[in-house]
Amino acid sequence: MTLLALGINHNTASVDLREKVAFSPDKLKEALQQLESHPEVTSSIIVSTCNRTEVYCDVTHSGPGVMIDWLAKFHRLSAEEILPSLYFHEEQAAARHLMRVACGLDSLVLGEPQILGQVKQSYYSSQEYDAIHGTLEKLFHKTFTVAKRVRTETDIGGNAVSVAYAACTLAKQIFESLSDTTVLLVGAGETIELVSRHLVEQGCNKLIVANRTKERAANLAEEFGAEVIGLPEIPEHLHRADIVISSTASPLPIVGKGMVEKAIKARRHQPMLFVDIAVPRDVEAEVGDLNDVYLYTVDDLHSIIEKNREQRKVAAIQAEAIISEESAAFMSWLRSLEAVDSIRQYRCFADDIKNDMLSRSLQAIANGVAPEKVLVELSNKLTNKLIHAPTRAMQQAAHNGEPEKLSVIRETLGLDSIKD
């Protein structure tokens, strides 16, 4: 059996090709069922996200040719269309690649945690369709353990490297608990949606979404349990917010110094955090001059993100060392299983010979043959039976001119330590 990983990702393939090779939920079921019945595949998992499509399998052959042909045929493409963008790994390299993917080291955003959840979901899907067994299943179990170790022993996921996540991290640094805060989100685009998701994950449960059109904001409100207001209503609600995060496409500022002064007064000077992600700015720069106000712009966030990227690179080096160690340990353990099977088979072989010879000897004694004669015959036959296979192997190695093989057999049998 050979562990094999092949696929395409954001580094090797265009969006157009990634779309063609992606597996929808319906396609995933069909694909896993095909692989389960494939004569050369014993176990398989498919990881398909917006940035990658990868097939992990345990196969009866080496080399990726059969799997490349299957992947192309399944998506009604020619092998030539996908071959330039494909990468593949075997055995320890395949194990190492999977661990790197699950730990976020192969992601567009270094160290991003979402990929681990996606890999786990792929594993559960493969389980559901009874497509994963044996060695591959053990590899995925090991990978999840390694990912946990990497998250625990390194800071690969501890530093924000996206604007949305950096905004939430900043809020968490200033306010001890986000569950006790009210957050006003200005805008309802993709960035604000990501901010909302991060805030809810961090325990925030009081969201107000202000947007030019309430229909768009209503979608966020439904998903995250937020209150919806229009942009003109911001002045009357601003004092309720401990945190304001803004990202609109407005050409002019939406929140002015005077508006914030009134809000601070109504709050009896309890501090407010403003995170202005918009370009041009949504919050007047003069707001930052007010007491009890913390104002951060997108430039401030970018400097934080750049610093965090460098810290993640250091953590990534530590993570790579862990993965190299763990992938080597996994393959060593896997090879030891092969030795265990061989030892068990050899013991069974020897036991069968022993039991057969013993049965014959006892029967001979019962039939009146002298015990001394039976013992001599037993020892001779037992010796001949046990040395037959290694004797043939040495003769064959000598006949074929294979001195290395002959040397291994001699070492295995301990012949080099016997003095003439």
Curated annotation (Swiss-Prot):
EC number of this enzyme: 1.2.1.70
Annotated substrate binding sites: 49-52, 107, 112-114, 118
Catalytic activity as recorded in UniProt: (S)-4-amino-5-oxopentanoate + tRNA(Glu) + NADP(+) = L-glutamyl-tRNA(Glu) + NADPH + H(+)
Positions bound to NADP(+): 187-192
Active site residues per record: 50
Keywords assigned by UniProt, alphabetized: NADP, Oxidoreductase, Porphyrin biosynthesis
CDD domains from the UniProt entry: NAD_bind_Glutamyl_tRNA_reduct
InterPro entries named in the record: 4pyrrol_synth_GluRdtase, 4pyrrol_synth_GluRdtase_dimer, 4pyrrol_synth_GluRdtase_N, GluRdtase_CS, GluRdtase_dimer_dom_sf, GluRdtase_N_sf, NAD(P)-bd_dom_sf, Shikm_DH/Glu-tRNA_Rdtase
Pfam name, any one: GlutR_dimer
Coiled-coil annotated spans: none
Pathway, per record: Porphyrin-containing compound metabolism; protoporphyrin-IX biosynthesis; 5-aminolevulinate from L-glutamyl-tRNA(Glu): step 1/2
Biological process per Gene Ontology, one example term: protoporphyrinogen IX biosynthetic process from glutamate
Important for activity (site feature) positions: 97
Function: Catalyzes the NADPH-dependent reduction of glutamyl-tRNA(Glu) to glutamate 1-semialdehyde (GSA).
NCBIfam families: hemA
Misc note: During catalysis, the active site Cys acts as a nucleophile attacking the alpha-carbonyl group of tRNA-bound glutamate with the formation of a thioester intermediate between enzyme and glutamate, and the concomitant release of tRNA(Glu). The thioester intermediate is finally reduced by direct hydride transfer from NADPH, to form the product GSA.
Subunit structure: Homodimer.
Domain notes: Possesses an unusual extended V-shaped dimeric structure with each monomer consisting of three distinct domains arranged along a curved 'spinal' alpha-helix. The N-terminal catalytic domain specifically recognizes the glutamate moiety of the substrate. The second domain is the NADPH-binding domain, and the third C-terminal domain is responsible for dimerization.
This protein's name: Glutamyl-tRNA reductase
